[in-house]
């Protein structure tokens, strides 16, 4: 097989491929055997007519076209591999010549990944925040543990206070008319949690069991349901019950109840370790993101529209899956937000362009630095996945197929590792603590 490549405009190339005659003839014979089984020819059993009879009945062109469909796909893949091309779209194929005893010639026009002009990507200055956990962070963490493991005490003769959990019946109206979804019975609501519209929960503070209250609220102007945005609503609320959190004292018994620690001191030390580890992970994630952003910003590349459009489509599909988890269709979301698919595509475009450029730049750096996953790294990742999914590694390997996606993911991770290793840490600017506090850390100690 012979293949020549010509570069065209806008990341397009033209491949001209010549497939050797014996290979073409074999495909023509195979095409005849396929077609003769599909055609009813008078006087012959199906599949038994000689080729010259089939040609008289349907002509040579269908046989040649079928042979081309057999030959061209693998020949195209071979030509792409030979010239180390990276197509990003389906090729436009033109058959130049196909006939008995002659080579098949075809042309394939296809868009390929663009060339990336890399800027500096080593020695990049990246801020690295210090990891620091204070006693106040640990105290706040413990407070959250107290809240989480608090006992609920039934309140009968006292008014509801902020932090209490009230059970309510409620029914709302807008412009004097009931509105779907604005009513409920025996609904548990923690006062001060921000679960309901701003102002709703505050108006229930001081209410007693079986007391009825009229609650007036105004929906935000940017509320997700356009029909309610900016509207005033009136709720008739009946408090059916009140429960108050009873916090356990912070002592050794509390530590034993909520963790595997024997003493409160041990629990505080465990919390410190967890918060420090969480902060380290946040700092490392921030460094990785920053170094990638700088490397990408320093590079120049013409973004292929087909890759951007695919990324936009992927974002819309992800949105649709998230909506389905909330029992909402994409059509309902668009109606509620007064948007169209075109609006979503416009919103998602900047992020899609950023993703595509990041992907292309990281691939170019990996190529420049010859970064590839080793067999040991591939095996280790399969072992890790097997532990997560509680499956045999061979089963995971089989389910992954050709491992191309796994290899790509490892390559990208190693490329980012390379950027971080070759970056230059600099002190952070004065902008407050960067580490995670007890308010945002994971709440359950070992």
UniProtKB/Swiss-Prot annotation:
Location of the region described as Disordered in the Swiss-Prot/TrEMBL record: 423-446
GO annotation terms (biological process): 'de novo' cotranslational protein folding; cell division; chaperone-mediated protein folding; protein transport; protein unfolding
EC number: 5.2.1.8
Gene label: tig
Domain of life the protein comes from: Bacteria
HAMAP family in the record: Trigger_factor_Tig
Biased composition (Low complexity): 432-446
Broadest EC class assigned to this enzyme: isomerase
Reactions catalysed: [protein]-peptidylproline (omega=180) = [protein]-peptidylproline (omega=0)
One cellular component term from this protein's GO annotations in UniProt: cytoplasm
Annotated compartments: Cytoplasm
Organism: Moorella thermoacetica (strain ATCC 39073 / JCM 9320)
Protein name in the entry: Trigger factor
